A protein has these predicted regions:
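Conserved helicase motor
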Residues: 56-61, 79-87, 106-109, 240-244, ...
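Interdomain helical connector at the RecA1-RecA2 junction of SF1/SF2 helicase-like NTPases
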Residues: 140-236, 250
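Conserved SF2 helicase motif VI
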Residues: 319-340
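SF2 helicase catalytic motif II
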Residues: 91-136
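A conserved SF2-helicase RecA2
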Residues: 160-170, 333-403
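Conserved helicase ATPase core of P-loop NTP-dependent helicases/translocases
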Residues: 63, 247-248, 253, 261-300
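Conserved pre-motif I regulatory segment
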Residues: 1-27
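Walker A/P-loop
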Residues: 22-43
Length: 408
């Protein structure tokens, strides 16, 4: 069986092979869900007598990619970045013809990065291909890993916004809701009380009171879920911040989800749990009429793909743009023609505007495609965003503006 590539991946593959011939290195920066690992598997398939060393953050990611492909490769030796680090002494014995660096932005981590450097120095003739949804390490001084590892040799680059605009990924329905806002209101109250001008204090307290009332009048999560989760026996991935946060969210399942479907099954996946593989496998094969929720922490941010997902639910404090896009990307799959649901449940006011970054990417892609005379590649220019707390966001922005100018 030969690997068939979607048009966008075939174009990227052609650029990769040309660049590898010319430069010996190439990076592909495509969003989650577009199937970029297939580009590397295709390369291995086309060069059966060449030896490939495939590095990735976890064996789990690699095994899932192979399972989804339904193929085996005799010419690929797999190794996780941490295993490479533990076996640094045997790097000299590897002698690959090709090195695949999957999720290559992770090579910026101090220890992993050192062993990857050592490998690249030990194999100067090996061609290297990097795959990632992002080349920037946002929380690490904006380091550009495509520059550091591939000398800026990018064979193909696409943002999440462009992938949606071009119809490579389906346009989602995006719902923004809010919960547990008391702490946020308390912090705003303290900022107001710290003002020196009594007139300003009174004015801002009025705004805060309006905001509090608007939040109290907004629908609770039970009604938000009941209204928007229309695939009542669908599969949803629920992202949480940590184990404690996950346990708290799971404790609310009966009150929040019973209006969607009284029969709910909860699966849990997190990296320290030995039962994760089984839970994940059961979730993937569950075809029952129950509402299926897979609660996870850090398992599915990158690399792992699940078929037949109806949507994702993000219960999140503020997170890096990389993780935010990876989590959204779990709901979007190339070749899928349904409208996936993204429920973004934030516990801070800043989180209400996260989606604006993606909307900006889409507008940028639209302008660029029109400017390049490629308007015919535009499939959609925007997607539906439902703000359950629109008034709250507007009031919060007014209050922020007022408080900022009060401090100046």
């Amino acid at each position: 069986m030969s690997i068939h590539l979607f048009k966008h991946n075939q174009e990227a593959y052609n650029s990769v092979t040309a660049m590898l011939e010319r430069e010996k290195m190439a990076a592909v920066i495509h969003p989650t869900g577009t199937g970029k690992s297939l580009i590397a598997f295709k390369l291995a398939e086309e060069h059966p007598s060449e030896k490939f060393l495939w590095l990735s953050p976890s064996e789990y990611i690699y095994q899932t990619q192979l399972e989804n492909l339904g193929m085996e490769f005799d010419n690929i030796q797999f190794m996780s970045y941490s295993r490479l680090m533990k076996n640094e002494d045997s790097i000299e014995t590897l002698h690959p013809d090709y090195i695949i660096l999957d999720e290559f932005h992770r090579c910026g981590a101090a220890e992993w990065g050192k062993s990857v450097r050592k490998l690249l120095n030990a194999c100067p003739n090996a061609k290297r291909l990097g795959l990632s949804a992002t080349n920037i390490r946002y929380l690490d001084n904006q380091r550009n890993m495509a520059e550091e590892i591939f000398d800026g040799k990018i064979a193909s680059e696409m943002t999440l916004g462009e992938a949606i605009v071009r119809g490579i990924l389906p346009e989602p329905k995006y719902v923004i809701a809010m919960y547990s806002y008391k702490k946020e209101l308390d912090q705003l109250k303290k900022r107001i009380q710290a003002l020196s001008n009594q007139g300003l204090i009174t004015e801002n307290q009025k705004l805060l009171e309006q905001l509090r009332r608007a939040l109290e009048q907004a629908d609770g999560l039970d009604l938000v879920f009941q209204h928007h989760i229309t695939q009542t026996s669908g599969k949803y991935i629920v992202f949480c911040a940590n184990k404690e946060h996950m346990d708290e969210m799971i404790s609310h399942v009966p009150e929040w989800f019973s209006g969607v479907n009284p029969d709910v099954v909860v699966y849990e996946a997190y990296s320290d749990d030995p039962n994760t593989d089984k839970a994940f496998a059961d979730f993937k094969t569950d075809t029952s009429d129950r509402l299926k929720l897979l609660f996870c922490i850090d398992m599915l941010n990158e690399g792992v793909h699940v078929e037949g997902i109806s949507g994702v639910i993000l219960f999140r404090p503020t997170i890096s743009p990389i993780i935010y896009k990876q989590q959204i990307g779990r709901a979007l799959t190339a070749g899928d023609n349904t409208t996936p649901l993204i429920l973004d449940v934030v516990n801070n006011f800043e989180g209400l505007t996260s989606i604006s970054g993606l909307q900006g990417e889409m507008q940028e892609a639209v302008h660029r495609l029109y400017a390049n005379g490629e308007g015919d590649r535009i499939v959609t220019e925007r997607f539906e965003v439902v703000e359950q707390v629109h008034d709250c966001r507007v009031l919060f922005e007014r209050l922020q503006e007022s408080l900022s100018s009060s401090w100046e």
